[in-house]
Amino acid sequence: MSKTEHPASGASPETRAAALRATLNRYAHEYYVLDQPSVPDAEYDRLYRELEALEAEHPELRTPDSPTLRVGGAVLPEFAPVRHVVPMLSIRTETDTTAGGALDFDASVRRELGLAESDPPVEYAAELKFDGLAINLRYEKGFLVQAATRGDGATGEDVTQNIRTIRQIPLGLRPVGGAVPDVLEVRGEVYMRRDDFERLNARQRERGDKTFVNPRNTAAGAVRQLDPKMAAERPLSFFAYGLGEAAGWSGMPDTHSGMLDALVAYGFPVSKERAAVKGGEGLVQFHAAIGAKRDSLPFDIDGVVYKVNSLALQRELGFRTREPRWAVAHKYPAQEALTTVESIGVQVGRTGAITPVARLVPVFVGGVTVTNATLHNEDEVRRKDVRVGDTVIVRRAGDVIPEVVAVVLERRPMEDVPGSDLFNPTQQPKHPPFELPRSCPVCGSHVVREEGEAVARCSGGLFCSAQRKEAIRHFAGRRMMDIEGLGERYIDNLVELEYVHGIADLYRLTLDDFLEMKRRADERDGVTPETVAAGKIATKWAENLLDGIRASKTPPLARFLFAMGIRHVGESTAKTLADWLGSLAIVRRAPAPLLLTLPDVGATVAEAIADFFAEPKNQQALDALLTAGVAPQGEHPPSAKLRDQLEPAELYAALGVPKLTAIRSKQLATLVPSLAQLANVDTAQLEGLPADVAASLLAWLDADDHRTRLGTLDALRAELLAAMPAGAAEEGALSGKTVVLTGTLPTLSRDEAKAMLEAAGAKVSGSVSKKTDYVVAGVEAGSKLARAQELGVRVLDEAGMLALLQNPPGDSA
């Protein structure tokens, strides 16, 4: 290769630098001005680093329009320009996303300060790097007079009227010590919480309007709305994190963390996810702690930021070109990346859901190599117009299944339309739009999509081997039946080699079945295990599997219900069914109106549960499990809390009779005080109701055998009332108490301990606060234990927790 060629492209350094500048400036315009980025941040950062390295090697190539000499985007002409008194400079981003990035920054600071290895560690303020729009708020004599965007760092845009609509931002400062600074510029980030973003998009869909791509762009677009009323409709939030100009501030703090505390006192929201830490190791720990929780934060972050805490040391360290030496942004592995769609297929889920899946050129994103990404459903594929050959943005966060966020349309493969020529060039996409298959790719059954459903489904049921596999995987899962050792490979072989046709078949398997299955699978795959080659047969794995299956026969009722794979029934709803109805026999017989009276059970869920247990094939599958020896544990009489839900007015309201509102249901209950009477009611008995309501009720009673069903519901109601404990609704022994679990317990799993505490009425929380009553600590308890000790919260070990459950507070036993 010639010395004049650049290795990334084979072009000369001058040509490559010009191409990079043009591309980066276009991407920056899309991101900062149009609020419509076409590529993820990681792609921009990669090209930026390439240009930065090229200009360092060839300084003569740096031009005035190089993005390496700028901070952000251009000023929008519709807003008045604002010159920043103190420039809003960006900070350097550490590209090493490992612990080494934090240690390198600490080493750099110590070098700049001339510190020896024996000198004390430097104290840093560690905080979040928010993913929103940077804003400068100017207060004079305690009142907000101006709000401006970062712009290019020197000049921003006046967005005061829009910022005033954000309720978190104070219009006036709270006096501290009876005074406020003469001038105070507070810098921070306008952002949008994830839940607010989801609600906003839900409203957009209801109106038939275009939905937004992500919270960051939505927040930025709202701030730049010319009409403040439109900006006010967007649910924006704000965090303060720094200062611009400050004058006439007596008692100004001498540390960054002290300054943030002062901003809280003045009335600004400051993120609680911050800490003052010592040295590089403290930075490493903060980076790891935030990394572990970032996907559970209610807002998006773009990494963390480290700042030398001492403001005096910040001044001593100063700046290099466009960045402070005393601060750095430390990112995490990119959650978005570019790749190419090789093909689009479908997966069949346990309920028959047909999910389109993009098969991708492997790409490293979110800390793992991703080869597949969900496209959710047919409508989503059409909306995004994902096609084979497209360059797409793929996102992966935490344990969430990777998804295709958007298509980079400018990179779509195109071809000439037949008949076009040099004078009439016409192009079209090389690949056609995706079409959902009309038959299941696994079993050949029809694919159907019911009216109002977003998801298409295979109609094959358990005849479809894909649905059988997924149903067994769900059933055997850790939070369901928890069958130890029954992994994906064994399930695939059991179904494919016809050993398991229904879930109950698991409990009829023998040692010989497993050994024969393994032999047949090895023959099919052309594998000869070492033990077989040596003339031996390994049996321990099969014995362990049988032990795991046998051990799963006595699950708690809630876990058994969750394991059944009822549509719309998750872990929480299964627990509600078990807690309130008490037994499998009652749950199986409960009609939709009764289920609808339970907490957090809506009409769709109630119908799904009732339909599941009314389906003959599901009844047969359930009976087969019970016959095979599966026996749910922890059954009890119906909860006394159910008594109020069984009042006729409550049940009438749950019947789904048109025009029979909750108020009219109470009125009906005074006229017709029992379900049995309602089943035989006539017009004369309904004279107290409005005529249209009475007519609607009589029409409902005459349709679909509703009178007979009312009689059945009335009999079940009487049975439940007779079976439940006498007296008022009972409370758990730990009702009203908040408990936090941390560390590894000696004999109980986290889920088991949580279930025991919740059964006693306790609320199990994930964080320690002043409202926490107990912390149950095991091995390697960590920061939650330290926080509990700091707050004086009572700490128990496993034995102490069990003793508490046996003898709760106020128990005389």
Swiss-Prot record:
It comes from the Bacteria. SUPFAM superfamilies: BRCT domain, DNA ligase/mRNA capping enzyme, catalytic domain, Nucleic acid-binding proteins, RuvA domain 2-like. The keyword Ligase applies. GO terms for molecular function: DNA binding; DNA ligase (NAD+) activity; metal ion binding. Residues 729-813 form the BRCT domain. Its cofactor is Mg(2+); Mn(2+). The keyword Aminoacyl-tRNA synthetase does not apply. Pfam families: BRCT, DNA_ligase_aden, DNA_ligase_OB, DNA_ligase_ZBD, HHH_2. It is an enzyme of class 6 (ligase). NAD(+) binds at residues 41-45, 90-91, 127, 150, 189, 307, 331. Zn(2+) binds at residues 440, 443, 458, 464. CDD domains: BRCT_DNA_ligase_like, LIGANc. Keywords: DNA damage, DNA repair, DNA replication, Ligase, Magnesium, Manganese, Metal-binding, NAD, Zinc. It catalyses: NAD(+) + (deoxyribonucleotide)n-3'-hydroxyl + 5'-phospho-(deoxyribonucleotide)m = (deoxyribonucleotide)n+m + AMP + beta-nicotinamide D-nucleotide. Its EC number is 6.5.1.2. One of its GO terms (cellular component) is cytosol. One of its GO terms (biological process) is DNA repair. The active site is at 129 (n6-amp-lysine intermediate). Belongs to the NAD-dependent DNA ligase family. LigA subfamily. DNA ligase that catalyzes the formation of phosphodiester linkages between 5'-phosphoryl and 3'-hydroxyl groups in double-stranded DNA using NAD as a coenzyme and as the energy source for the reaction. It is essential for DNA replication and repair of damaged DNA. This is DNA ligase. It comes from Ralstonia nicotianae (strain ATCC BAA-1114 / GMI1000) (Ralstonia solanacearum). The lineage of its organism: Bacteria, Pseudomonadati, Pseudomonadota, Betaproteobacteria, Burkholderiales.
